[in-house]
């Protein structure tokens, strides 16, 4: 199941599994892992320039002010942070926020990371665009916007 389904647009506020992306670019792919008796899908092997798309969020008149992502960075040196750009409607669309993911010590050692976002209204696709050095950057488990 992806976000490009027949059920209508998504609300930006509930937590969404990252593995529900409707499009992935580059080396990134969906993996699953058994956590607390339930298989969770997440995006793995993300590299510089890869992106994940989610269609469509209905922001309506919701006053979102932030964004939180559960992610992991298997690097051990703090100079190897990954950067995630939150863009609307395309990989080079309007930038609404930027999130840094420093090393967490393991590729599934999930931590929550947050950033402020610019106000958004209406219906939009969300593109998570990833940047960094040295091949594999991070894994992403889930995310949501904050009102």
Regions found by a protein language model. Give the residues of each.
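Extracytoplasmic
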Residues: 1-147
């Amino acid at each position: 199941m992806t976000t490009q389904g027949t059920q209508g647009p998504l609300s930006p506020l509930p937590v969404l599994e990252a593995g529900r992306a409707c499009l992935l670019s580059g080396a990134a792919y969906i993996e699953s892992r058994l956590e607390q008796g339930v298989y969770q899908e997440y995006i793995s092997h993300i590299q510089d320039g890869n992106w994940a798309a989610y269609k469509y969020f209905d922001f309506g008149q919701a006053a979102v002010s932030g964004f939180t992502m559960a992610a992991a960075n298997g690097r051990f040196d703090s100079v190897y942070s990954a950067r995630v750009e939150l863009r609307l409607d395309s990989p080079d669309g309007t930038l609404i926020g930027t999130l840094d993911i420093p090393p967490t010590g393991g590729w599934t050692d999930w931590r929550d990371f947050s950033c402020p976002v610019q106000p958004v209204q209406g219906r939009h696709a969300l593109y998570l665009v990833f940047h960094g050095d040295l091949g594999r950057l991070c894994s992403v488990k889930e995310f949501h916007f904050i009102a």
